[in-house]
Amino acid sequence: MSDRLFIFDTTLRDGEQVPGCQLNTVEKIQVAKALEVLGVDVIEAGFPISSPGDFNSVIEISKAVTWPTICALTRAVQKDIDVAVDALKFAKHKRIHTGIGTSDSHIKYKFNSNREEIIERAVAAVKYARRFVDDVEFYAEDAGRTDNEYLARVIEAVIRAGATVVNIPDTTGYCLPSEYGAKIKYLVDHVAGIENAIISTHCHNDLGMATANTMAGILNGARQVEVTINGIGERAGNTALEEIAMIIKSHHEIDIETNINTQKIYPTSRMVSSLMNMPVQANKAIVGRNAFAHSSGIHQDGVLKNVQTYEIIDPHDVGIDDNSIVLTARSGRAALKNRLSILGVTLDQEKLDKVYEEFLKLADRKKDIHDDDILVLAGADRSGNHRIKLEYLQVTSGVGVRSVASLGLNIAGEKFEAAASGNGPVDAAIKALKRIIDRHMTLKEFTIQAISKGSDDVGKVHMQVEYDNQMYYGFGANTDIIAASVEAYIDCINKFTK
């Protein structure tokens, strides 16, 4: 019988630490439900003590999903654990993920402590967490740069204290695969009682080795992997769930299995990309748009004769459907709801009605509606509780003349109008906006992304605005790229005028 590899998804915790990728609670629930359908074993739902938003998200996700274990992150601090316990009170299966830094640099500079004291704090945290839950995971932060002998002492102590999972993070993404694999093997061979806990990997991609290190860990005895959808995460990201799942599925000689329904990988990838406003690079393994594209004549000829000549993965195995349905203005609510369900998106009736209204408006402006358009519609409406909303926008522009824009805003129910000229339509529109919103804001980043193909398709705009020495990220989506730009700017403003 094959060994079981447990999939611990941290998209909603580590993945959400990417600047500009923060989700609201409704969106987090949407992702959590998709992860449940995908088949992940553990969902790390947040760091409850870090913010009221994270605390509430853990509570609501615990209510929304049934069979995955819901995990809450803490430091090795009693107050953190108390808050995590409270946040997990509705979870059917619950886990506390507590830990402390173990490398010499963390011990000396972060904690101003010593090795023995760190072990004492680690043991105390695990014992305290075990008073409330049966499933406690311990992380040895910066284990990648912790010497193996001391790391083994820490891990042995926390297992004796009751840890059920021991997480060995390559926090800085520094380890070579051979080095990381040897570290896991050292723990397997030298930690008394290691058979009483599951060894987990948690690898970062700073040097592009997250997936390789994770596989090295698996091959040397790790039986849980901590991953994110699309490899999203802090700095250069984390190990990508889709890569590990398909490596395990493709290499039968490893004799390990997961619970992942691989046909849900691609829809989940697209949904997370859309909700987090984080495009997937074209050449990304498994889920990039070029992952199964062949431009070389020799490759094309081989694939036409037999796909196995150059394709080691069947696109259908990851949920890529060549015959995806194209919706039109004549498509009804049921067709839209069904397509959203296939894409991993579940909406309540009120939200579905709003999305359907926007769908009909979009269908009037363009002939065919594709999956990416639908995902944008399902994730783009964040204006419900916004204080500032765009009422109208009119722009006059041409070659050799300055652009002129006039717009109207609704600010907490009060109407405002302004006009301005500028060097191009976007510049004019933003200058008009600034005449109403009299704040000193600096546009730091402005990115336009085409969602699908065709001149009438939806465009997404991502903006980064600096205000009062803080960075705010905004998003807009519209078939009119000028309107999308204004929506993105307003989205930024709403972040600091709550």
Question: Language-model segments: what does each one mean?
Answer:
Residues 4-5, 11, 246-248, 252-419, ...:
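A mid-to-C-terminal "edge-of-domain" accessory segment
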Residues 5-7, 17-42, 55-64, 78-199, ...:
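Alpha/beta enzyme core
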Residues 14, 18-19, 47-52, 103-105, ...:
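Short, small-residue-enriched loops and turns at beta-alpha junctions
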Residues 17, 22, 30-31, 368-472, ...:
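Non-catalytic terminal/interface segments that mediate subunit docking, oligomerization
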Residues 67, 169-171, 226-234, 249-258, ...:
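Short beta-alpha connecting loops at secondary-structure transitions
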Residues 175, 182-305:
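Catalytic alpha/beta core domains of metabolic enzymes, predominantly
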